[in-house]
Amino acid sequence: MKKIILYFAIVATMMACGSKGEEKTIMEAEGLEFDSIVADTLVRLTSEKGAPEAKVHLSLMFATKGDNAKAVNDTLLHSGLVVPDYLSDIDAKGNIKAALDTFLIRFANDYKKNYAPLYQRDREHKASYNIVLNCKAKINSYKDGIINYQVETYNYAGGKDGLRWTLSHNIEAKTARILTLDDVLVPGYEKQLKEKVVEALCDKFDADDLKELGEKGVMYDIEPYPSNNFILKDGAIEFIYVDSEIAAHDKGEIRIEVKGIDDLWK
């Protein structure tokens, strides 16, 4: 299993050797050690040869050492990491591998329960009943005391294309809670932050204003908003808009970094 050790307060030698803008992965004091835990399954819809099948691959990160490891893991399990969100209903009792195995069993049972009757009546479209679910987590820290936890998901459930999206959580190491914008920004931040979001989108898509953004298919007929899917950084917030959230599918996932908000931080 791949191990990543997170600490909070960067080592001076790392700062000297690291390149500008390098992501911090090893820091010192108040340590939490994470391991990747992998779970896979392949489920055939029926016992017939060549029957449709569901393939699931989960590669998630969980804390294995550290004073707050259990609390961090409990937070992660109840944070909607994977869709369907079966993990939130599982009482892991500290056994993360057992929780993932339980997820796979429930996924397999629901796949057969929901798809088998449909397949029995629709043998001509066998490929439509194939499912793929891949979830891969990564952790980092871009801001002292905060673990950024991202899950990249690919889900195919019939049709032409699968869906890809990224989920980002910012976990305060000392409390194990997931931080929201309200937790880190001063009251009344909304108007100024919205303006900064529009400004960043205009820079990204070479637009002069919100109207031109809309003409380019971004935030068209949508009231601009900061995504609740974001990465906290030193002096900046990177917002993630999933595929088709604020623009057409061909633009894919959209990420913008909002800076110049020093007066908004708590």
Q: Can you describe what each PLM-predicted range is?
A:
Residues 13-16:
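C-terminal motif of bacterial Sec signal peptides marking the signal peptidase cleavage site
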Residues 6-10:
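Sec-dependent N-terminal signal peptides
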